[in-house]
Amino acid sequence: MPAAPDRAAYLATQSLTVLVPVYNEEESLGQFVVEMDKFLAETPVPTTVLFVNDGSTDGSLAILRDVCRQKPNYEFISLSQNRGLSTAVKAGIDHARTTLIGYIDSDIQTTPLDFLTFFEFFPKYDMVNGIRAKRQDTFVKKMSSVIANTVRRTLINDGIQDTGCPLKILKTEYARRIPLFHGMHRFLGALVQLQGGTVKQLPVRHFPRFAGTAKYNLWNRAWKPLVDTFGFRWIRSRWKNYEIGEAHRQQAAGATTTGK
């Protein structure tokens, strides 16, 4: 862990966008904003909450419009149709203009207040990923998640214990280089590692679902992650990193910049 003065100096230069994918969550959005406001009152860095409406067909979009009109720290973008969680996350990453990017679901099964402990591990680590402790889910949901995580770790050996945990913060420089593909959201930690980044994993609290129903079933919790894992293995085999050793760029006034 970095020394406190170093961390304080680092955080003084940082800003955070918290991505919140939304798909038919009208029943939980009001309480979610209440919980997020508690975090905004304590966050050590300037923070924007960015809702990504993934083609909701209920009243979610109307609620997001009202929230963002009333609260200056809240923004939203709305996809023209439902594209899935990976696309919603990638759209949020592309839209963010901060140095750090967080992620949380809007179903209030995790609390944004746990983000506060994540900041302790920057800048030493490039991503902090939660691990849901004492999961408050059905037996089928918990077992399918255990199976999927075990198979994924066996096939790609990334060491990420709970890749589906909806509580993460990562440096934007790494998030920007993450490609969009089916199931991308399941491999955020592994994709940071592919870039040479480091991932810290922390236990976080987990709660019963506040309202509504889960958008996943046994098919997309077990079989689809397996298929996506083989897709990730192919991407990993073709992955390339690079570093710029020197650059020369013309400035607007005609000056030049050269450096290493």
Predicted regions, residues:
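N-proximal low-complexity "stem/linker" segments adjacent to membrane-targeting elements
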Residues: M1-K38
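Hydrophobic helical membrane-anchoring modules
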Residues: M1-Q14, N157-D158, F181-K260
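Donor nucleotide-sugar binding loop of glycosyltransferases
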Residues: E25-S28, S56, L85, T111
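Acidic helix N-cap motif at the loop->helix transition within catalytic regions
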Residues: E27-Q31, D58-V67
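Short beta-strand/loop segment that forms part of the nucleotide-sugar
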Residues: V45-G55, I77-L79
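A conserved acidic beta->alpha catalytic loop
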Residues: N53-A62, I108
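Acceptor/aglycone-binding surface of glycosyltransferases and processive sugar-polymer synthases
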Residues: E75-H95, L100, Q109-R186, F207-F232, ...
